[in-house]
UniProtKB/Swiss-Prot annotation:
Ranges for domain ABC transmembrane type-1: 130-421
Protein's recorded name: Iron-sulfur clusters transporter ATM1, mitochondrial
Record-linked SUPFAM superfamilies: ABC transporter transmembrane region, P-loop containing nucleoside triphosphate hydrolases
S-S bridge residues: none
Mitochondrial intermembrane topology ranges: 152-175, 273, 380-394
Residues that hold glutathione according to the record: R300, T301, E302, F303, R304, N363, A364, G365, Q366, G413
Provenance organism: Kluyveromyces lactis (strain ATCC 8585 / CBS 2359 / DSM 70799 / NBRC 1267 / NRRL Y-1140 / WM37) (Yeast)
Amino acid sequence: MIMFRSLSVTPVWKAGLSLSHRSIPINSRLSSVRNYISIGCANKTGSRLLRSAGVSSQYKDFRRFNSSSNGNGTDKNASVAPKTEVKKIVPPKPSTNGKSKTPTISELRIMKDLFKYIWPSGDNKVKIRVLIALALLIGAKLLNVQVPFFFKQTIDSMNIEWGPDVATVLPVAITMTILSYGAARFGAVMFGELRNAVFAKVAQNAIRKVSLQTFQHLMKLDLGWHLSRQTGGLTRAMDRGTKGISYVLSAMVFHMIPITFEISVVCGILTYQFGSSFAAMTFVTMLLYSFFTFKTTAWRTEFRRSANRADNKAASVALDSLINFEAVKYFNNEEYLANKYHQSLSKYRDSQIKVAQSLAFLNAGQNFIFTSALTAMMYMGASGVMEGALTVGDLVLINQLVFQLSVPLNFLGSVYRELKQSLIDMESLFKLQKNPILIKNTERPLMLPEHLPCEIKFENVTFGYQPDRNILKNATFTIAPGKKTAIVGPSGSGKSTILRLVFRFYDPQQGRILLDGKDIRELDLDELRRIVGVVPQDTPLFNDTIWENVKFGRINATDNEIVTAIEKAQLSDLIHKLPKGTETIVGERGLMISGGEKQRLAIARVLLKDTPIMFFDEATSALDTHTEQSLLKTIKENFSDVAKTSVYIAHRLRTIADADKIIVLENGAVREEGTHNALLANPNSLYSELWNIQENLDMLEDELEDELKLEKEPRTSKKD
């Protein structure tokens, strides 16, 4: 039998509704009281809520009653707590530059990381494709270099005196030369296109593997890492990084290697055909052109990095604003967020303007170098023709060979610029893969205990999300197998942290968590998480159908098992009312359904998962009383099996009064533990204090509801 400890304070409650607070609407006072009940602890926040309800005198009298040494409602012997100095909160200083302090990855390291995807160990099919693509590349460039030679031969062949005795039909030799010219040009293009087709599969496979491995790595990172990152920035970094891989691969195979090969061939031909002076001029031009391009591009790189940072920030602001659309509307902060988004876009605009201006400078410098060299070589060639050392065809050949380099050289500038940009984008992607996995299996993980459910034991566990602020402090307690255990306490005492530690979202800094005597850090991580089910306070749902969200509890479940879980969670009524039934989209984070329906969906998920250990993390605290009672009934019907260990983290003590064991936390340590009756039997226990506060607030809630009804009655009679 549950014992309800009553207090002789009813007159105080009635007297507390003083005339000075009658001006406060009853609905407002009732809402404040209900909010305080949901807090479930006697703290300063609750005191403010009560004052807003106009019942601060009751709260003070009740506190005096509970804190008195003799328990008779007086506070003569009550000790007065010393006043503590209130520290002022200092607003954060605005960022002055916004530059990232994170270390960069060298370009050589990035290329090395990428190379293993295009030349994978043990995958001969991919290697053969790469070799075929390189062979086609070389063939295309050799044919491309032959084009100016056929053009030269055609011009020299036609350098004859045409008269009436000369046949009107071109000689066969000239015809063959022209046809060879066309065939070489067509062959070079076809070889290039075949190279693209052969290498496309290699490039796309590399992109797929990098994206998949990055995603899998992100899924293995700890919860703390994800909570400290902005989702919008992460998705943008992955998107740009994969595009960067695509460009780097195409640039290397389709541009950088071909350009280098073609320049080498042209320099060799010029040296062999016309002497070292033409080759030296070409070589010096290439050096100057490349040096200017690389130096200028390196200078422009920081502008691009700055643009990326601003782009990430803008994406994060936009995504956060859209995800929290309701909150934006509640507080009328559309203009504030628009200004915030505008600031990020302005920084992106400024960086992009610098990128465009520096690009104009780069293009002008490149054209000046190349045009100067081409003019000088044309002068040298024309001089050779006038001296008789060269033919007109030779002059055309020199012009064609050098001018033919202008196309790849122009590509060299743009390719190098984009290559640097792509490497920056890939740097962000590969950085994600370099983040260390803190929560992982040991080299030889142990098997789970044979008998489930098993005992969960915390041994001197100390843990904090921040190094200088511990949430749990040397906590020691035991959760018995097959029993209902409740964990209660004031906000911030570490209740939800216990769930996160058992699930191994984090590892404790000190102490151990044991399952039947085995440290959970030594158990297989996937197996551990497979036997723990969670119904959280705010159920995370995907923007998908009800059916798919329930199925997420166990992907390989049969249709009958999913239907059974839906029926047990009492979702059938909702589904029958919806036009599309189980195919109804729940919306982003489940915003298209009510809080109670979201929790029932969460219950259906864990029913489908069917785990021997269950955690209910304040699963009903955000719901109204009627919905809460209905859900508690559903939970009791489905999770009362002795083969399951149920752990309830709760603020509302009425919901866990029937627990086999109640653990009371305060300031990160176990204050007391026992059954509901045993804890209430001790008038000085924290649990007794919390219980009495909530019980008397329930009384006040009932009185305010009655007063609200009386207030409505005269209005009804007047209408009649």
